[in-house]
C-alpha cells in the first residue's frame, strides 16, 4: 500500500 497507489483514480 503506497500513498500514490491509494490516490490514483482508476
From Swiss-Prot:
Keywords: Antibiotic, Antimicrobial, Bacteriocin
Coiled-coil spans in chain: none
Temperature impact on function: Thermostable.
pH curve summary: Active from pH 1 to 10.
GO biological process: defense response to bacterium; killing of cells of another organism
Functional description taken from the UniProt entry: Has antimicrobial activity against L.paracasei BGKP20.
The protein's name: Bacteriocin BacGR
Protein's organism: Lacticaseibacillus paracasei (Lactobacillus paracasei)
Amino acid at each position: 500500500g503506497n500513498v500514490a497507489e491509494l490516490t490514483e483514480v482508476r
